[in-house]
Amino acid sequence: MAGRQPLVDSLRAHLSARERPDHQRLAVVVGPPGAGKTSLILRAAHGLRDRFPDGQIFVDLHPPASAPLTPDRLVRRVLRSLGGTPAPDGPEEAGARLRDMLSRRRVLVVLDNADTEAQVRPLLVDDVRSAVLVAARRELSALPGQFAHHVGALGRADAHQMLEDLVGTARTRAERSAATAVVEFCARLPLALHIAGLWLSTRPHRSLRDLAHRLADEEQRIRFLRVGDLSLQDSVAAYHRALPAHIAAPLHRLVDLRGDFGTAEVMARVTPSREHAVDLLDELLYRQVTHVSGTGDDGGATRYRLHDAVRLYTAHCVPGPPGLHAPAA
Protein backbone atom coordinates (compact mmCIF):
# COMPACT_ATOMS: atom_id res chain seq x y z
CA MET A 1 0.00 0.00 0.00
CA ALA A 2 2.99 2.31 -0.48
CA GLY A 3 1.55 5.71 -1.31
CA ARG A 4 -2.01 4.39 -1.44
CA GLN A 5 -3.21 4.80 2.15
CA PRO A 6 -4.83 8.22 1.53
CA LEU A 7 -6.89 6.67 -1.26
CA VAL A 8 -7.85 3.74 0.98
CA ASP A 9 -8.99 6.25 3.61
CA SER A 10 -11.04 8.19 1.03
CA LEU A 11 -12.78 5.03 -0.17
CA ARG A 12 -13.63 4.00 3.38
CA ALA A 13 -14.95 7.46 4.23
CA HIS A 14 -17.19 7.56 1.17
CA LEU A 15 -18.58 4.05 1.61
CA SER A 16 -19.30 4.51 5.31
CA ALA A 17 -20.89 7.98 5.07
CA ARG A 18 -24.44 8.10 6.46
CA GLU A 19 -25.27 11.77 6.55
CA ARG A 20 -27.30 11.69 3.31
CA PRO A 21 -30.24 9.27 3.24
CA ASP A 22 -30.42 9.50 -0.57
CA HIS A 23 -26.68 8.97 -1.00
CA GLN A 24 -25.79 6.04 -3.25
CA ARG A 25 -22.70 4.38 -1.83
CA LEU A 26 -20.75 3.34 -4.91
CA ALA A 27 -16.99 3.66 -5.31
CA VAL A 28 -15.07 2.71 -8.46
CA VAL A 29 -11.31 2.30 -8.79
CA VAL A 30 -10.09 2.35 -12.40
CA GLY A 31 -6.62 1.62 -13.72
CA PRO A 32 -4.38 -0.32 -16.09
CA PRO A 33 -3.29 -3.93 -15.58
CA GLY A 34 -0.87 -4.37 -12.71
CA ALA A 35 -1.83 -1.11 -10.99
CA GLY A 36 -2.84 -2.84 -7.76
CA LYS A 37 -6.59 -2.26 -7.95
CA THR A 38 -7.52 -5.61 -6.37
CA SER A 39 -5.19 -5.15 -3.41
CA LEU A 40 -6.48 -1.62 -2.97
CA ILE A 41 -10.17 -2.51 -2.80
CA LEU A 42 -9.49 -5.50 -0.55
CA ARG A 43 -7.54 -3.28 1.86
CA ALA A 44 -10.33 -0.71 1.84
CA ALA A 45 -12.97 -3.41 2.42
CA HIS A 46 -10.99 -4.95 5.28
CA GLY A 47 -11.30 -1.73 7.28
CA LEU A 48 -15.07 -1.58 6.77
CA ARG A 49 -16.13 -4.84 8.40
CA ASP A 50 -17.66 -3.06 11.39
CA ARG A 51 -19.62 -0.71 9.12
CA PHE A 52 -21.24 -3.61 7.26
CA PRO A 53 -22.06 -6.18 9.96
CA ASP A 54 -24.32 -8.25 7.66
CA GLY A 55 -21.35 -9.29 5.58
CA GLN A 56 -18.98 -8.60 2.73
CA ILE A 57 -19.30 -10.40 -0.59
CA PHE A 58 -16.39 -10.57 -3.05
CA VAL A 59 -17.02 -11.47 -6.69
CA ASP A 60 -14.45 -11.67 -9.50
CA LEU A 61 -16.48 -10.61 -12.52
CA HIS A 62 -13.96 -11.80 -15.09
CA PRO A 63 -11.61 -14.52 -13.80
CA PRO A 64 -8.58 -15.49 -15.91
CA ALA A 65 -9.36 -17.80 -18.83
CA SER A 66 -13.11 -17.53 -18.13
CA ALA A 67 -15.98 -15.67 -19.72
CA PRO A 68 -17.10 -12.55 -17.86
CA LEU A 69 -19.93 -12.98 -15.41
CA THR A 70 -23.25 -11.84 -16.86
CA PRO A 71 -25.43 -9.50 -14.78
CA ASP A 72 -27.96 -12.29 -14.19
CA ARG A 73 -25.29 -14.73 -12.97
CA LEU A 74 -23.89 -12.03 -10.70
CA VAL A 75 -27.32 -11.35 -9.20
CA ARG A 76 -27.88 -15.03 -8.49
CA ARG A 77 -24.43 -15.49 -7.00
CA VAL A 78 -24.88 -12.56 -4.61
CA LEU A 79 -28.36 -13.78 -3.70
CA ARG A 80 -26.97 -17.20 -2.80
CA SER A 81 -24.29 -15.54 -0.68
CA LEU A 82 -27.03 -13.67 1.18
CA GLY A 83 -29.03 -16.84 1.74
CA GLY A 84 -31.59 -16.24 -0.98
CA THR A 85 -33.05 -18.88 -3.32
CA PRO A 86 -33.11 -17.28 -6.76
CA ALA A 87 -33.34 -20.40 -8.92
CA PRO A 88 -37.11 -20.28 -9.69
CA ASP A 89 -37.09 -16.58 -10.56
CA GLY A 90 -36.45 -14.94 -13.90
CA PRO A 91 -33.75 -12.24 -14.18
CA GLU A 92 -36.08 -9.35 -13.31
CA GLU A 93 -37.56 -11.11 -10.29
CA ALA A 94 -34.13 -12.17 -9.05
CA GLY A 95 -32.85 -8.61 -9.44
CA ALA A 96 -35.79 -7.17 -7.53
CA ARG A 97 -35.32 -9.71 -4.76
CA LEU A 98 -31.63 -8.84 -4.48
CA ARG A 99 -32.27 -5.10 -4.32
CA ASP A 100 -34.86 -5.67 -1.62
CA MET A 101 -32.40 -7.71 0.44
CA LEU A 102 -29.64 -5.12 0.01
CA SER A 103 -31.99 -2.32 1.05
CA ARG A 104 -32.78 -4.10 4.33
CA ARG A 105 -29.23 -5.15 5.24
CA ARG A 106 -25.85 -3.55 5.69
CA VAL A 107 -23.73 -5.40 3.17
CA LEU A 108 -20.61 -4.41 1.24
CA VAL A 109 -20.36 -6.00 -2.21
CA VAL A 110 -16.84 -5.93 -3.65
CA LEU A 111 -16.58 -6.46 -7.42
CA ASP A 112 -13.24 -7.10 -9.11
CA ASN A 113 -12.40 -6.89 -12.83
CA ALA A 114 -15.56 -5.10 -13.93
CA ASP A 115 -15.80 -4.69 -17.70
CA THR A 116 -19.17 -2.96 -18.12
CA GLU A 117 -21.69 -0.84 -16.25
CA ALA A 118 -24.28 -3.59 -16.78
CA GLN A 119 -22.37 -5.84 -14.39
CA VAL A 120 -22.68 -3.28 -11.59
CA ARG A 121 -26.15 -1.77 -12.06
CA PRO A 122 -28.16 -4.69 -10.57
CA LEU A 123 -26.48 -4.07 -7.20
CA LEU A 124 -27.20 -0.35 -6.95
CA VAL A 125 -29.81 0.55 -4.35
CA ASP A 126 -31.02 4.04 -3.43
CA ASP A 127 -30.34 3.41 0.22
CA VAL A 128 -27.44 3.98 2.58
CA ARG A 129 -27.46 0.56 4.20
CA SER A 130 -25.46 -1.37 1.59
CA ALA A 131 -22.55 -0.27 -0.59
CA VAL A 132 -20.68 -1.41 -3.68
CA LEU A 133 -16.91 -1.16 -4.20
CA VAL A 134 -15.63 -1.85 -7.72
CA ALA A 135 -12.25 -2.37 -9.38
CA ALA A 136 -12.77 -1.68 -13.09
CA ARG A 137 -10.69 -2.33 -16.18
CA ARG A 138 -12.15 0.67 -17.98
CA GLU A 139 -14.11 3.82 -17.28
CA LEU A 140 -17.65 3.11 -16.10
CA SER A 141 -18.86 6.58 -16.95
CA ALA A 142 -22.56 5.73 -17.20
CA LEU A 143 -22.90 4.64 -13.58
CA PRO A 144 -24.74 7.32 -11.59
CA GLY A 145 -23.36 8.94 -8.49
CA GLN A 146 -20.09 7.06 -8.43
CA PHE A 147 -17.06 8.08 -6.38
CA ALA A 148 -14.36 7.35 -8.98
CA HIS A 149 -10.61 7.17 -8.49
CA HIS A 150 -7.89 6.42 -11.03
CA VAL A 151 -4.73 4.55 -10.11
CA GLY A 152 -1.64 3.86 -12.18
CA ALA A 153 2.08 3.58 -11.65
CA LEU A 154 3.46 4.53 -8.26
CA GLY A 155 5.63 7.56 -7.78
CA ARG A 156 9.34 6.79 -7.74
CA ALA A 157 9.72 7.21 -3.98
CA ASP A 158 6.71 4.98 -3.26
CA ALA A 159 7.90 2.36 -5.76
CA HIS A 160 11.33 2.22 -4.12
CA GLN A 161 9.66 1.97 -0.71
CA MET A 162 7.52 -0.95 -1.87
CA LEU A 163 10.56 -2.84 -3.15
CA GLU A 164 12.44 -2.05 0.06
CA ASP A 165 9.53 -3.30 2.19
CA LEU A 166 9.59 -6.62 0.34
CA VAL A 167 13.33 -7.15 0.01
CA GLY A 168 14.74 -5.37 3.02
CA THR A 169 16.49 -2.08 3.54
CA ALA A 170 19.99 -3.56 3.68
CA ARG A 171 19.75 -5.29 0.30
CA THR A 172 18.20 -2.39 -1.59
CA ARG A 173 20.56 0.22 -0.16
CA ALA A 174 23.58 -1.97 -0.84
CA GLU A 175 22.61 -2.04 -4.53
CA ARG A 176 20.97 1.32 -5.08
CA SER A 177 21.55 1.53 -8.83
CA ALA A 178 20.27 -2.02 -9.39
CA ALA A 179 17.23 -1.30 -7.21
CA THR A 180 16.48 1.78 -9.33
CA ALA A 181 16.80 -0.30 -12.50
CA VAL A 182 14.40 -2.94 -11.14
CA VAL A 183 11.85 -0.28 -10.19
CA GLU A 184 11.94 1.26 -13.67
CA PHE A 185 11.91 -2.09 -15.49
CA CYS A 186 8.76 -2.85 -13.48
CA ALA A 187 7.31 0.46 -14.75
CA ARG A 188 6.60 1.22 -11.06
CA LEU A 189 3.53 -1.03 -11.23
CA PRO A 190 2.56 -2.52 -7.84
CA LEU A 191 1.96 -6.02 -9.25
CA ALA A 192 5.28 -6.11 -11.08
CA LEU A 193 7.13 -4.77 -8.04
CA HIS A 194 5.39 -7.28 -5.79
CA ILE A 195 6.47 -10.15 -8.05
CA ALA A 196 10.02 -8.79 -8.26
CA GLY A 197 10.17 -8.46 -4.48
CA LEU A 198 8.92 -12.03 -3.98
CA TRP A 199 11.45 -13.33 -6.50
CA LEU A 200 14.26 -11.68 -4.54
CA SER A 201 12.97 -12.54 -1.06
CA THR A 202 12.75 -16.24 -1.94
CA ARG A 203 16.25 -16.14 -3.46
CA PRO A 204 18.48 -14.53 -0.83
CA HIS A 205 21.52 -15.79 -2.75
CA ARG A 206 20.60 -13.71 -5.82
CA SER A 207 21.41 -10.03 -6.13
CA LEU A 208 19.29 -7.15 -7.32
CA ARG A 209 21.79 -6.85 -10.15
CA ASP A 210 20.90 -10.41 -11.20
CA LEU A 211 17.23 -9.47 -11.34
CA ALA A 212 17.90 -6.21 -13.17
CA HIS A 213 19.90 -8.15 -15.76
CA ARG A 214 16.99 -10.54 -16.35
CA LEU A 215 14.48 -7.71 -16.62
CA ALA A 216 16.67 -5.77 -19.06
CA ASP A 217 15.61 -8.19 -21.81
CA GLU A 218 12.48 -6.39 -22.95
CA GLU A 219 11.25 -9.30 -25.05
CA GLN A 220 11.23 -11.65 -22.05
CA ARG A 221 10.47 -9.16 -19.28
CA ILE A 222 6.72 -9.57 -19.04
CA ARG A 223 7.00 -13.38 -19.18
CA PHE A 224 9.66 -13.38 -16.47
CA LEU A 225 7.53 -11.39 -14.01
CA ARG A 226 5.73 -14.42 -12.63
CA VAL A 227 5.82 -16.02 -9.16
CA GLY A 228 3.42 -18.84 -8.36
CA ASP A 229 -0.02 -17.79 -9.56
CA LEU A 230 0.95 -14.10 -9.74
CA SER A 231 1.72 -13.05 -13.30
CA LEU A 232 1.96 -9.66 -14.95
CA GLN A 233 1.48 -11.32 -18.33
CA ASP A 234 -1.79 -12.94 -17.23
CA SER A 235 -3.03 -9.62 -15.87
CA VAL A 236 -2.39 -7.83 -19.16
CA ALA A 237 -3.76 -10.76 -21.18
CA ALA A 238 -7.11 -10.40 -19.42
CA TYR A 239 -7.28 -6.76 -20.53
CA HIS A 240 -6.20 -7.57 -24.07
CA ARG A 241 -8.79 -10.33 -24.49
CA ALA A 242 -11.54 -7.87 -23.57
CA LEU A 243 -10.55 -5.40 -26.29
CA PRO A 244 -12.88 -5.34 -29.29
CA ALA A 245 -11.24 -6.02 -32.66
CA HIS A 246 -11.49 -2.39 -33.77
CA ILE A 247 -9.29 -1.46 -30.80
CA ALA A 248 -6.93 -4.46 -30.64
CA ALA A 249 -5.92 -4.33 -34.31
CA PRO A 250 -4.85 -0.65 -34.33
CA LEU A 251 -3.02 -1.19 -31.04
CA HIS A 252 -0.54 -3.45 -32.84
CA ARG A 253 0.33 -0.60 -35.18
CA LEU A 254 1.29 1.62 -32.24
CA VAL A 255 3.44 -0.70 -30.11
CA ASP A 256 6.74 0.46 -31.56
CA LEU A 257 6.04 3.99 -30.33
CA ARG A 258 8.13 4.04 -27.16
CA GLY A 259 7.58 7.70 -26.51
CA ASP A 260 4.46 9.78 -26.53
CA PHE A 261 2.21 10.22 -29.55
CA GLY A 262 -0.90 11.99 -30.68
CA THR A 263 -3.36 12.36 -33.51
CA ALA A 264 -0.71 12.79 -36.23
CA GLU A 265 1.04 9.52 -35.36
CA VAL A 266 -2.24 7.60 -35.29
CA MET A 267 -3.21 9.05 -38.66
CA ALA A 268 0.15 7.99 -40.11
CA ARG A 269 -0.06 4.42 -38.77
CA VAL A 270 -3.73 3.52 -38.47
CA THR A 271 -6.15 5.73 -40.38
CA PRO A 272 -6.08 8.86 -42.55
CA SER A 273 -9.27 10.06 -40.86
CA ARG A 274 -8.65 12.66 -38.16
CA GLU A 275 -12.03 11.95 -36.53
CA HIS A 276 -11.30 8.22 -36.43
CA ALA A 277 -7.84 8.88 -34.96
CA VAL A 278 -9.26 11.14 -32.24
CA ASP A 279 -11.97 8.60 -31.39
CA LEU A 280 -9.39 5.80 -31.22
CA LEU A 281 -7.20 7.82 -28.85
CA ASP A 282 -10.21 8.43 -26.61
CA GLU A 283 -11.09 4.73 -26.62
CA LEU A 284 -7.54 3.63 -25.80
CA LEU A 285 -7.50 6.02 -22.85
CA TYR A 286 -10.99 4.97 -21.75
CA ARG A 287 -9.91 1.32 -21.74
CA GLN A 288 -6.73 1.99 -19.71
CA VAL A 289 -4.41 1.09 -22.59
CA THR A 290 -2.80 4.53 -22.64
CA HIS A 291 -2.37 7.45 -20.29
CA VAL A 292 -2.07 11.17 -20.92
CA SER A 293 1.59 12.16 -20.93
CA GLY A 294 1.19 15.88 -21.52
CA THR A 295 0.52 18.41 -24.25
CA GLY A 296 2.43 19.33 -27.37
CA ASP A 297 5.18 21.91 -27.49
CA ASP A 298 2.61 24.55 -28.39
CA GLY A 299 0.58 23.68 -25.28
CA GLY A 300 -2.29 22.46 -27.42
CA ALA A 301 -2.79 18.86 -28.57
CA THR A 302 -2.88 16.15 -25.93
CA ARG A 303 -0.07 13.58 -26.03
CA TYR A 304 -0.48 9.96 -24.99
CA ARG A 305 1.73 7.04 -24.07
CA LEU A 306 1.02 3.32 -24.03
CA HIS A 307 1.16 1.73 -20.61
CA ASP A 308 4.48 -0.12 -20.66
CA ALA A 309 3.09 -3.53 -19.70
CA VAL A 310 0.43 -3.26 -22.41
CA ARG A 311 3.07 -2.32 -24.98
CA LEU A 312 5.34 -5.23 -24.04
CA TYR A 313 2.51 -7.76 -24.03
CA THR A 314 1.13 -6.60 -27.38
CA ALA A 315 4.57 -6.51 -28.98
CA HIS A 316 5.94 -9.82 -27.70
CA CYS A 317 3.14 -12.09 -26.50
CA VAL A 318 0.37 -11.97 -29.10
CA PRO A 319 0.52 -12.19 -32.91
CA GLY A 320 -0.55 -9.15 -34.83
CA PRO A 321 -3.60 -9.18 -37.08
CA PRO A 322 -3.28 -10.25 -40.75
CA GLY A 323 -1.85 -7.54 -42.94
CA LEU A 324 -0.28 -5.73 -39.99
CA HIS A 325 2.58 -4.34 -42.03
CA ALA A 326 0.41 -3.28 -44.93
CA PRO A 327 -0.11 0.48 -45.29
CA ALA A 328 -3.09 1.82 -43.38
CA ALA A 329 -6.14 2.33 -45.61
Q: What do these predicted regions represent?
A:
Residues N113-A114, A135-E139, G197-L198, D308:
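A short beta-strand-to-loop transition that corresponds to the Sensor-1 phosphate-sensing loop
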Residues A212-E219, R223-V227, D308-L312, C317-V318, ...:
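Amphipathic helix-loop-helix modules that constitute alpha-helical solenoid scaffolds
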Residues M1-D112, V128-A136, F147-A153, A159, ...:
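Walker A/P-loop phosphate-binding element recognition
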